[in-house]
């Protein structure tokens, strides 16, 4: 039997959501490139990144869709929620308005993804402690009340960026193992052992507009 030309067993689709300027694209760039881009133009539409990680001995390719935070792009970016296995919902710990808008982002995520989508709340810019406008405790309480994973991170220093993507992947993989995530479901957001480079559900999305590393 021919061996599939892949060095991973699963593909997980992620989306990154949240207000404009919270650092979504900077988190993605830090995770995929191990670099911080200080001056990122805002994302126009959707951007895309990938990286292979390991969870419980399994190689997993993350396909990550970074969505624009501006209201005028919401209709476009909502189409990318479909079939997401994981969602990273980001706010800026120094801007309370971005935290106050989380309920709206969460409503979209709940309504447009499958019931088993793993959502992790990320308080970005943890390196700016002196400018903090949202406490760790209140964000943690919001996460607990809504059944979300939670951590604070810094796209600038790299603090907890790796953990944000990995913790979501661990939970998704756990859901696969315990049977709560049906890999045969069209909206699972997971592919197991793909057999062709462009085959399957996860690469059927429209091509994103790539306009630099927007925050």
Curated annotation (Swiss-Prot):
SMART domains attached to this UniProt entry: RAB, RAN, RAS, RHO
Activity-regulation annotation: Regulated by guanine nucleotide exchange factors (GEFs) including DENND6A and DENND6B which promote the exchange of bound GDP for free GTP. Regulated by GTPase activating proteins (GAPs) which increase the GTP hydrolysis activity. Inhibited by GDP dissociation inhibitors (GDIs) which prevent Rab-GDP dissociation.
Gene Ontology BP term (one): regulation of protein localization
One CC-aspect GO term: endomembrane system
Modified residues (Cysteine methyl ester): 215
Xref: CDD domains: Rab14
Primary location: other
Lipid moiety-binding residues (S-geranylgeranyl cysteine): 213, 215
NCBIfam families: small_GTP
Family according to the record: Belongs to the small GTPase superfamily. Rab family.
Function comment: The small GTPases Rab are key regulators of intracellular membrane trafficking, from the formation of transport vesicles to their fusion with membranes. Rabs cycle between an inactive GDP-bound form and an active GTP-bound form that is able to recruit to membranes different set of downstream effectors directly responsible for vesicle formation, movement, tethering and fusion. Involved in membrane trafficking between the Golgi complex and endosomes during early embryonic development.
Entry protein name: Ras-related protein Rab-14
Gene behind this protein: RAB14
